[in-house]
Regions:
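Membrane-embedded catalytic scaffold of the fatty acid hydroxylase/desaturase
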Residues: 1-98, 169-185
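Transmembrane helix-loop junctions in multipass membrane proteins, especially transporters and channels
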Residues: 16, 78, 82, 90, ...
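Membrane-interfacial segments at transmembrane helix termini in multi-pass membrane proteins
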Residues: 138-185
Length: 185
């Protein structure tokens, strides 16, 4: 129950337990640092984490601008990421443990987002805090959380000495899962 409770705290930052379990426990820990499979390596076009990702001219400046974008991580959870991930994961029939019905998962996502907005935006305004102070506090909270989470994630998997192995033509990896974890972390 402790693990379930602690995992549920992701809702405080607008995350979703199902999405986190699939992205982190299934995709990331099964396919750690494998481009195209580990979603932690996919930051869209703006940041390039691996040599396999397409290179754009602006990537030569990413060491200067990426840290500012890291703070937007939990904003993305709140606004778009959870909806996109859930659609994608349900389409692929991915789950961690016993699979819940799509209707239950979508209902949970929508209700927790409504509760989230109610607690962090509506309630402070209702109790008399001016809207602009609420928005500043909301931004600072999210930016700080996003920055901390992103830096912790990147230090674990996207540093100079980690590797990004790719499967051979048959889709097989050259190392066992445990050895792969050591090389990629």
């Amino acid at each position: 129950w402790v693990n379930k409770f602690m995992g549920g705290t992701i809702y405080v930052l607008a995350g979703n337990v199902y999405n986190w379990q699939v992205q982190h426990n299934v995709l990331h820990h099964t396919y750690t640092n494998i481009p195209g499979h580990d979603e932690d390596l996919d930051a869209g076009r703006v940041i390039r984490f691996t040599k396999e990702a397409k290179w754009y001219n602006f990537h030569r400046f990413q060491q200067y601008y990426s840290v500012f974008l890291y703070g937007l991580l939990t904003f993305n959870w709140a606004i778009t990421t959870d909806f996109k991930q859930m659609r994608r994961y349900l389409k692929r029939k991915l789950s961690y443990g016993e699979a819940k019905s799509p209707k239950t998962l979508w209902t949970t996502l929508i209700i927790t987002k409504i509760i989230y907005v109610s607690i962090w935006i509506v309630l402070p305004i209702v109790i008399g805090i001016t809207w602009w102070k609420v928005l500043i506090g909301f931004f600072v909270m999210h930016y700080t959380a996003g920055l901390i989470l992103s830096i912790v994630f990147q230090l674990a998997h996207v540093v100079e000495d980690t590797t990004n192995p790719t499967p051979n033509e048959l889709g097989e990896m050259s190392n066992t899962w445990a050895i792969h974890q050591l090389y990629t972390t």
